[in-house]
């Protein structure tokens, strides 16, 4: 028994052990299976993950329309994307303006949520960078494991100083669209391009960089998904096409829609009421602009095919979503508007939208609404990332991949269209101003406290200086595109973006006006301040004054060196104050300094005449009296320098000359009156003044004549000659009444400064009086000719005789040698040591001076001067020359800008209008063929009161546009019966209809996130009638279709054809669909036409009214 019991125990233990082992092995297997499944689920590099997360490519154009038929001239794109994928017939932008629309595309938010109102207001601002830019679809997909790349235009005010978050490969265009002469930020390095098609044509470079990004991404990690954005500048201005396409698409008139040149429009907003019909030159311009736009799109068409072929070669075509769309539409002549965007009509808000990818049925047509705010949620859905709550859009993948009818039935049928510009009320404007003033006051207080800490603590000072030095280094190493505009060929005046500026309301204008009042910058550093403000990512140092900022920035040793290639700024210390200069003017400054004439009196010289007279030329002191303080014009084409002479004692004759100078000025003012008002005694008065001046001048010349004779008698010792005369009258010379000789003080001969001062005084007065004599003679001549009866020949001869006596002493040579009063000559000095230099005097431009100079050359022998070696110019003179060279460069730049300003003002003189945005066009706007050879013109295409909010609804029963303007105007367009929106039917709305649409619009204007999606049937009018008739040109949702070749599609550039939605009809009355006739390729054989009756109850009594609007209702 014991043996059996023990045996049973052993067997039971074995069984229990086997059972435990079995359970344990199962548990291990289940855990290993879970781990492998989890690894497959979350591994980014697994095959299953690769299948779930496809590649995403967005191809974005700029200003491409649908209503004008531009997409029909891109056969490659239509064949690869439309025929190979799906087409959304109702794709719209929520704001028809570049920067707001692109900001909505990146963030999936309406304008009233991301706060980018215009192309200038908050576009790529620090606020945008800190809040919304960090939440773009690129950041979410990059964090989810996608390799992201962006190439092309980004935002209009992107300055290239940073790389937006979320993009691993970055090639963003700096500022607005261009095809040549642009700069890009390529992975943090700024690259400037020129005007060479082979190297610089931007659409081709975008395609090349994108293809290189795809190749490198798959070579590095073939299983990692890719997000690529290709943002082309076409067909935005300046519409520079590739040379091989410049001969295509002439005489294309697809933009001549029924609303083309439909002007004026008294039932629409103010800008359309005042717009007159286009002139013939305007129509020619729209035709040529349409041609150039189509030509630029050919490069995009080729790029789409290149990317398609590259994906095919890489084996990624079936695993890649390719989305093709535009930021907004465009108009050319519609309602008399020559060109532009920013209107809520179909031609500005409707955009092309094509998509192909895994799971998308080929040649599929989708009639549900898709918006630009839906792109970001769609991309996140493609990548398996849940849509954030702040995004206003929704993913469109269910429309493409799901066959559930409930998805289409619940899809939103209404959306919001917002114009660019703020919409604050008067109370909000006042609140914004008060808040801005408080912020400025707080900033000043913070700066004052920071300054105290800056002065007290040395450590903090070092920190501030080091951070500012880093900022200065970054600024000196970067070159901003807008500041280099003077050296570039300006090919785009950006008048297309003027639309956004006009939509700004009074609040933004008031804030800008306040900012202008506070911007008090000095002229020399204005461009520096602009660049400092544009670099948004640099640390903001709260400097109190500009001098503090310059002291901090110029502490960087890199800015103290001479200008090197690629260096932009250079710091120069001028008299203890730092100044920043642009290096691009450095070479010009050197050339100016090399070409400037040098002064002659820079060396000490001894001069000898053939008569044995010896005199010296002594260098003037560095702070001498030769500095130019004022420039006066003395006639056309001639300048003279007027020196200030500070003296304490003047001779009596000089004081008399100063009094005479005032008398002459009074006579000049007196003769400015008309000749008939001058009295007959004016001639006699002028003659008396001339005689008085000449007598005083003779005394002065007599003094210097005696001085010259005295100098020749004592040439052996020039400092002993003053000892023969007694000192009298202070530091000056005087005429002895008894001997009629000139006596001078010894100080004049011993002190060089006193001698030079005395000489300069007399020299100045002599030249001044000679000028006055010339003017008085001209005045006298005019009076003598005008008064033929008064002046006798004797007085004229007497005046001539007196003039001859004052100039020449009959046969005795000149009384007075002008070589003592020689001014600085413009002849450059020579650097050869010991070279003979000849100094010659010159007088004024009057007849007296020219006669004296002629006589001086005739009777005075030429002197030879020997000068000491050149030791180089002193510091003061070199600074003066550099200052003069900079002044000349500045004047040259100012003249260049002034010429441009005058030319622009001349072109825009007739089209400028208050609170309107206008542009001018001439033959200088386009630089590539085909050129504009017609006459220039101006046109105003938008106004700042064109600010609106619109409700757009498209469903099975209704197709309308309801708008409310800030001016109080209400417009309503029924596109079911008026597809081109030519008639405003707001007067025909009932109060209930208007109230319902107003409430729906208010709901959308303040919506956020999910509340921005209004479900279908929720927006139907009160007492909703269910009319079976769809909007015109409606297509069945799930209908597959083929398209004819391009030649057949050009004529029918809009919808394929009218269809009827038969889902609302009973099955017995539905039309039967026929198969597509592949032999004929006809687009009209989708349905077999069968007449059917429509009961009166099936028609909508509200929106099918065709009565016209009376003038009173309009």
UniProtKB/Swiss-Prot annotation:
Ca(2+) binds at residues 62-63, 98, 327-328. Residues 466-479 have a biased composition (Low complexity). Its EC number is 3.1.6.-. GO terms for cellular component: cell surface; endoplasmic reticulum; extracellular space; Golgi stack. Residues 1095-1114 have a biased composition (Polar residues). Residues 795-804, 876-895 have a biased composition (Basic and acidic residues). It holds the Pfam family Sulfatase. Residues 1-25 form the signal peptide. Binds 1 Ca(2+) ion per subunit. CDD domains: G6S. The conversion to 3-oxoalanine (also known as C-formylglycine, FGly), of a serine or cysteine residue in prokaryotes and of a cysteine residue in eukaryotes, is critical for catalytic activity. It is found in: Endoplasmic reticulum; Golgi apparatus, Golgi stack; Cell surface. Glycans are attached at residues 122, 159, 181, 208, 251, 447, 683, 713, 743, 817, 945, 955, 974. Its cofactor is Ca(2+). Belongs to the sulfatase family. This is Extracellular sulfatase SULF-1 homolog. It comes from Drosophila melanogaster (Fruit fly).
